[in-house]
Amino acid sequence: LNYFSLNAEYRINKNFSARFGKGTTFIGNGYRSMLLSTNHTPYPYFTFITEFWKVKYYNHFTTFYDIYNSDISQKKHGAFHYLDYAVNNNLTIGLFEAIIWQSSDENFERGFDVHYLNPIIFYRPVEFSKHSPDNALIGLNIDYSFKAVNLYGQLLIDDLNINRYENTGDGFFQNKLAFQLGVKSQFSINEHKFNFLSEFNQAQPYTYAHKHPMQNYTHM
């Protein structure tokens, strides 16, 4: 049942649509994604999509299961915002944010936190106002195309402490970054069509992790 997927989409009108079911979602333009990928088993989700002018805006809500915990009653939830803006015919920029929190612990049954149903970017002020221990991440997605070539990249910030970075370097647990750089192209030679893709991905130590393991940005 872990690999079973079922997805549905309902278009309300030209500006609004909804997707829901059990599946996966991919954010990005490359082979992999440092923001949200499909490299895991399906999970329950609901996505509300708003489209207008040059903008696509996604509200994405999920239920995850911890990769190291075999007890499927131990759930965690995710709330995501992703804003995709087409600057022009060549350049698209996306802003990403996510909050991961555990459904319960030994003392408290929290469930899905309705504070994160806020449809407006940003989550960070909500988390701060609640004095929340949740796992917060932000990111950037860029795609630039010209002729038959696409240049793309991503940056994910899980945690960043500039003052400590100079003294402690990559291994400091409060400097958690991931990035992606890539290029892809389609071209023809003597009527034969070719696809080319080259991509580099890197994540700093402890990126996606959290001091409370159930709040790691992972799914089984």
Regions found by a protein language model. Give the residues of each.
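Well-ordered mid-protein domain cores that form the structural environment of catalytic cofactors
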Residues: L1-Y57
